[in-house]
């Protein structure tokens, strides 16, 4: 994970945020649209990103339409929403929308 580890160094810059998307792209590929796709098959990139950036500087992206042919949109969504590294609740809400709203200025009028 050397390239990903180097990317985590960007977290030292306080004005940077990171988008988590396409996790099925970096995981072992399941058969197309298997409902039992396990997010645990993904390398520890989410854990590394949460440790480096924290939930308030991470945002989820669907990677749709490519995710539809890999892990499926539902699995991509639930994989992050319920990821153990986000401990549910506030952390997951930050990643699933609040960070993007802050970064892009949504609702700031």
Feature roles, as predicted:
Residues 1-59, 70, 108:
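Catalytic pocket-lining loop regions of alpha/beta-barrel enzymes
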Residues 62-64:
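Active-site metal-binding loops of divalent metal-dependent hydrolases
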Residues 47-48, 52-59, 68-109:
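Mid-to-C-terminal alpha-helical segments outside catalytic/metal-binding sites
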């Amino acid at each position: 994970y050397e390239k990903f580890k180097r990317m985590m160094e960007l977290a030292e810059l306080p004005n940077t945020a990171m988008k988590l998307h396409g996790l099925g792209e970096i995981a072992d590929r399941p058969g197309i649209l298997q409902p039992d796709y396990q997010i645990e098959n993904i390398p520890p990139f989410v854990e590394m990103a949460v440790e480096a950036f924290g939930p308030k500087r991470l945002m989820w992206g669907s990677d749709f339409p490519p995710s539809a042919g890999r892990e499926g949109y539902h699995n991509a969504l639930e994989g992050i929403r319920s990821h153990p590294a986000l401990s549910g609740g506030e952390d997951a809400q930050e990643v699933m929308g609040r960070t993007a709203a802050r970064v892009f200025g949504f609702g700031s009028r």
